[in-house]
Regions:
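Transmembrane alpha-helices and adjacent helix-loop boundaries
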Residues: 1-332
Length: 332
């Protein structure tokens, strides 16, 4: 078990190291793409805390993401750069407060009712920015000046913004990994496995679920802030149910119950999107990239029930099964 645990974190450490080295060898397009994927990975980990770790299938994660992004733009002056030290916490806090409100009501329901309530609250937030001038309507709004931290941190530099995002990706992973290995995380695992048994053991599960929901919303707000700063633009589609659905696909594709699965799923999902959108590879079929992406995801889920994190185990079993029985006896 210790070797397995060490191996998992060694793999994750190598991935983080590779991402840290990428700006020195990657193109400007690649830098922008990987920055976007890292933001989606942070967002996917926030949902993994709910779905994979607590057993709460939330269909409104995009709302918290969008709130973090809109706060970053709406609270930024049009004539100068905002101070990063207060704008970033404001985005996280706004998303967390809305998550606290949504969670306080939705967590009193279960199953499909919980899914529908979270979706309803997400759509409410979507239409607030879609149908009013507050969020620029369907046109969205621009971030004219990216936030700064004096002369120390200039996020207008693509490499600086990349490393800024990378730091928060690593921080999110470490924070959630420590959280899930704490007493709080063990209670969440117990709720996922059998909530009634946890209640019978004397645990009041509602506060734990609400704390997890609020934490998840705050991290989603962090991802939204990073996305707004990277693109310099936000629109209502950031809050649409399509993004919430895509996030669920990411964590299922990567492997539920694993933080590294959320990261792997985010990378796999976006790379598959870019692959099937390539007209240089697929020609006219690239216009129908959703078909290729859909069939590939279905195949991955069918062949890899544990997600992409389970791929090494599947390959190991197939290799062991393909060896002659006599050879296996000799190896033993």
């Amino acid at each position: 078990m210790d070797k397995l645990f060490t191996g998992k974190f060694l793999f994750t450490g190598l991935v983080f190291a590779g991402l840290a080295l990428y700006p020195f060898i990657g193109s400007s397009y690649g830098l922008d793409l990987v920055s976007k994927i890292m933001i989606y990975a942070i967002l996917a980990m926030s949902l993994e805390l709910l779905v994979g770790s607590t057993g709460l299938v939330c269909f409104g994660q995009a709302a918290f993401f969008g709130i973090g992004a809109y706060i970053a733009v709406l609270f930024s002056p049009e004539s100068e750069s905002a101070n990063l030290l207060w704008l970033l916490p404001a985005s996280i806090l706004a998303a967390a407060v809305y998550a606290l409100f949504v969670g306080a009501l939705s967590l009193r329901t279960k199953g499909v009712y919980f899914i529908m309530v979270t979706l309803a609250f997400a759509q409410m937030a979507y239409y607030v920015v879609h149908d009013t001038k507050l969020g620029g309507g369907t046109d969205g709004i621009y971030l004219y000046f990216k936030p700064i931290l004096g002369s120390v941190l200039d996020l207008n530099n693509p490499k600086t913004l990349y490393f800024f995002t990378w730091v928060f990706l690593v921080w999110t992973f470490v924070f959630l990994a420590m959280l899930l290995r704490s007493h709080f995380g063990r209670v969440l695992a117990g709720i996922r496995i059998n909530e009634q048994r946890m209640r019978a053991s004397g645990f009041s599960t509602y506060p734990y679920k609400l704390a997890a929901f609020t934490t998840s919303g705050g991290i989603a707000g962090l991802a939204g802030f990073l996305f707004a700063v990277k693109d310099g633009f936000v629109n209502p589609e950031m809050m649409s149910w399509h993004l919430s659905g895509a996030l669920l696909i990411m964590i299922i594709l990567g492997g539920l119950g694993h933080l590294r699965g959320a990261i792997i799923g985010a990378f796999a999902f976006v790379f598959l999107q870019e692959f099937f959108k390539s007209s240089a590879i697929f020609g006219e079929f690239a216009k129908h990239w959703q078909l290729g992406l859909g069939f590939t995801i279905i195949a991955c889920v069918a062949l890899l029930p544990k997600g992409l994190v389970g791929l090494p185990e599947v390959l190991r079993k197939r290799l062991d099964g393909s060896r002659p029985r006599d050879a296996q006896v000799v190896l033993k």
